[in-house]
UniProtKB/Swiss-Prot annotation:
PROSITE patterns (alphabetical): RIBOSOMAL_L20
Family per record: Belongs to the bacterial ribosomal protein bL20 family.
Alphabetically ordered keywords of this record: Ribonucleoprotein, Ribosomal protein, RNA-binding, rRNA-binding
Gene name tied to this protein: rplT
Stated role: Binds directly to 23S ribosomal RNA and is necessary for the in vitro assembly process of the 50S ribosomal subunit. It is not involved in the protein synthesizing functions of that subunit.
Name assigned to this protein: Large ribosomal subunit protein bL20
């Protein structure tokens, strides 16, 4: 059986990891073993936080809508219930943007939902 020399394959694999780890502090960006650990952790964090970002933005939108709704004398849950009954199909992201950018329009939405 002939000997397998992994020169090119191993070097490409290591260089790929080191390229990803470029800019990390100290040995974390220079030494393969520590860079590999840092890259694996970074990719895990990135995967987890892509899922978390969706939750975080939804929480932010709800907090903004709630604050604006209370300024108009209504709670968040009542507003959302009234919007559903009035068959107003506007999502939380758009409601939050209305509340921040154009409070008059948001007030119109609130009054429309009360009818």
């Amino acid at each position: 059986m002939s000997r397998v020399k992994r020169g090119n394959v191993a070097r490409k694999r290591r260089n790929k990891i080191l390229r990803i780890a470029k800019g990390y502090r100290g040995g974390n960006g220079k030494l393969f073993r520590t860079a590999n650990q840092r890259v694996m952790k970074a990719l895990c964090n990135a995967y987890r936080d892509r899922k978390r970002r969706k939750r975080d933005f939804r929480r932010l939108w709800i907090a903004r809508i709630n604050a604006a709704a209370r300024l108009n004398g209504m709670s968040y849950s009542k507003l959302m219930g009234n919007l559903k009954k009035a068959d107003v199909r506007i999502n939380r992201k758009m409601l939050a943007q209305l509340a921040v950018i154009d409070p008059k329009s948001f007030k119109n939405v609130v009054t429309h939902s009360q009818k």
